[in-house]
Amino acid sequence: MFHQQVYRLTLYDIDVDYNLYGIRVTASSYSNGCNAGYTAFTRQVDLDAIQNPSLTHVFSAGNNGNSNCNYGAGSGWGNITGGHKQGKNVLATANVTGADIIAGSSSRGPAHDGRIKPDIAALGTNVFSCLAPNDYRSITGTSMACPGIAGVMAQLYDAYKQNNNGIDPEGGLMRSLLTNNADDLGNPGPDFKYGYGRVNGLRAAKAIEMGWYIKDSVAQGEVDTVNITVPGGNGVGELRVMLHWTDPQATVNAGRAFKSLTNARPAFTVA
């Protein structure tokens, strides 16, 4: 279903779209400032995720890769284009070339408060795309990468429902499955250019089909122990463990956006 309206209204109308039309994944490449911090839009998209647990907003990271947006690290850093893209519970998408190199124009992190942004990377260079009013052309930008991530997410949502009796997944779980199964690029681990790496939808789908995730909860002061059995043999080269939660919305202009699990101390023991 194609749904077009003023962008400002779209964010605030997602509750209606979520319940009336069953919208679970959105994609948008609109910009709203550069290194804008925790704005009213940021708060809204984080609130969207709290009020609509299965929702995932997918955004472009922006095309200001060489800009200095006063983050404090000089040109080329901290230039994500819009507060909504800096949300804690959304995906901001970087643009990589066919050779898995970050495009020079692709906006870099971190977020205003130092968090990892962008979150994920996808092909956004020389993508054959539609062009208004009725044409097609090869286009480059994070606006080309963003729809690719939204499409992969839609397939992963469908895979989850097929493996769980038609039940909608939690948006936070889907975002963590996507990012934790990405192909690491750039510096080892997540970084401010590629996020968690280039999307690998097949590996994320396999994680869903194999049930390689745990949904659990823990109360304040509790200790929860989870055992993970790793298959033996030469075929296992790496174990990735990601702790994910949907964080409540913060106040506008908050210097530090995270509100929960501020004293959490995850510990991993290999036996």
Range-by-range predicted roles:
Residues 1, 20-27, 51-57, 87-92, ...:
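Loop/turn elements at helix/coil->beta-strand transitions in domains of secreted/extracellular proteins
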Residues 121-188:
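Hydrolase catalytic cores
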Residues 1-44, 51:
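Subtilisin-like peptidase catalytic core
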Residues 227-261, 267-268:
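Hydrophobic beta-strand segments within beta-rich accessory/binding domains
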Residues 19, 31, 46-53, 95-98, ...:
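Sec-exported extracytoplasmic/periplasmic mature domains
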Residues 3, 27-31, 58-62, 94-95, ...:
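A cross-family glycoside hydrolase active-site/sugar-binding cleft signature
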Residues 158-236:
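C-terminal subdomain of the subtilisin-like protease fold in secreted/lumenal serine endopeptidases
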Residues 8-11, 34-36, 42, 60-89, ...:
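Active-site-adjacent substrate-recognition loops and nearby beta-strands
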